[in-house]
């Protein structure tokens, strides 16, 4: 109780040093990033206003340069810094996948795929190639555009898998509409890839469909 009361009286930087970053609210984390407020507006007030404008950290971090810089108190310097922080986070998650048994940390896989795919304007079909201990060998964007049976070629996926000696695959693609519910075509493509993979004893561990702040897992829904 004493620590809780004490944390309320601390500025964000001091609070982070005392209790660690997870103890901070979104507003406090953003205030540290912004560093200073503007005339007539403290940094905490500015942080609160920014989050209200973009609705969430996700909304802020996915904003375009124009959307970001049109808000009073934000400029090109902060936009560049935010893009750098976002990219470092993505690369950190990718390194985590390489250092861990990927499927035993499926939440990390999902977070990484959401970070890399959910704000894309076109559909992108990615494949994570894993070894027999489910560690990441490589990640590859295989196909761009509308995902259907005419644009996705299972043989190309299997060819890449055999070339890098992959034992298992995780499939993923995004829905720019924001709705992750798989289409009939998504299901058919997944079935064809799974059938082709089984012929060479490669497992399909999951197929993630990434929407806006949400996802659909074929494995979790027992479609694999």
From Swiss-Prot:
Signal peptide from the UniProt entry: none
Disulfide bonds: none
PROSITE patterns linked to this entry: MPN, UPF0758
MPN domain mapped to chain residues: 102-224
Keywords: Hydrolase, Metal-binding, Metalloprotease, Protease, Zinc
GO biological process: proteolysis
Keyword Chaperone annotated: no
Naturally occurring in which organism (per UniProt): Pasteurella multocida (strain Pm70)
A GO term for molecular function: metal ion binding
Similarity annotation: Belongs to the UPF0758 family.
Residues noted as binding Zn(2+) in the record, renumbered to the chain: 173, 175, 186
Motif (JAMM motif): 173-186
Name recorded for this polypeptide: UPF0758 protein PM1152
One matching Pfam family: UPF0758_N
Cited CDD domains: MPN_DUF2466
Gene3D superfamilies linked to this entry: Cytidine Deaminase, domain 2
């Amino acid at each position: 109780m004493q620590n809780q009361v004490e944390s309320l009286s601390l500025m964000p930087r001091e609070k982070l040093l005392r209790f660690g970053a997870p103890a901070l609210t979104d507003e406090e984390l953003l205030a540290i990033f912004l560093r200073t407020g503007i005339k007539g507006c403290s940094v905490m007030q500015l942080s609160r206003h920014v989050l209200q404008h973009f609705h969430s950290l996700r909304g802020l971090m996915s904003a375009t340069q124009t959307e970001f810089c049109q808000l009073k108190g934000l400029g090109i310097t902060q936009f560049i810094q935010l893009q750098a922080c976002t990219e470092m986070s993505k690369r950190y998650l990718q390194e985590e996948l390489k250092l861990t048994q990927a499927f035993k940390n499926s939440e990390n896989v999902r977070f990484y795929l959401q970070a890399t795919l959910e704000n894309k304007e076109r559909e992108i079909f990615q494949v994570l190639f894993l070894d027999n201990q489910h560690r990441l060998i490589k990640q590859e964007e295989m196909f761009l555009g509308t995902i259907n049976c005419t644009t996705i070629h299972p043989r190309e996926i299997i060819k890449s898998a055999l070339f890098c000696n992959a034992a298992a695959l995780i499939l993923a693609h995004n829905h720019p509409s924001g709705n992750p519910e798989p289409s009939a075509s998504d299901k058919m493509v997944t079935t064809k890839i799974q059938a082709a993979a089984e012929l060479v004893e490669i497992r399909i561990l999951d197929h993630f469909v990434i929407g806006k702040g949400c996802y659909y897992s074929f494995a979790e829904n027992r479609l694999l």
